[in-house]
Amino acid sequence: MIDSVSYPSLPVPLANATGAMDDNCIYIAGGQETMVNEQSTHHFYMLDLMHKERGWQEMPDWNGPSLSYAVGVAQGERFYLFSGRSYAPDEAMVEHTEGYVFEPGIGKWSKMIGSFPVMAGTGIPYGEDKILLFGGVEEILPTSSEHPGFSRKLRVVSTSTNSLVDSLEWPYRIPVTTNVVSVGNQVFIVSGEVQPGIRTPFILKGSF
């Protein structure tokens, strides 16, 4: 038997957004409202699961470009937003590598130190003060059979210093446009794109 729970609808339709859950709050950031005349956004919403009747609350957006295909992670009662790209019907697409952190207690964003080229990648909290960022698109290259695939890097971010502290090279291709799930000391990345337009049926598993 499968149980289902109803949640409030988002204020606007969104695709290619990112999100994360911290305690009882779900955060959704960026994305685009339509697949016609595509345009990235500054949307930032929060749903308090203890007060679902209030619906999604519009939160202050980050002081930076509009974003889609960003990576969102919650850690230590904060929401972190990495990389992504901006675009509009009359503007060229621009890839971004900045990182931002939102502190719900004061309702403000701050910019992080360094560069995080992880567009369309995945991320999870690790321990009490770390974030793991898996893969991503470091550079947008022409789509062809010669495409090398996406980043194989595992990046480690310290939430104490709000900066990148380490990076490792994985022996396997890390998919993008998918999700990562942690179970105990293991992480799973299911399917996703390993080259533009090519999705994999495989599941990557890592242990820490």
What label would you give each PLM region?
Residues 1-208:
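Kelch-like beta-propeller repeat domains
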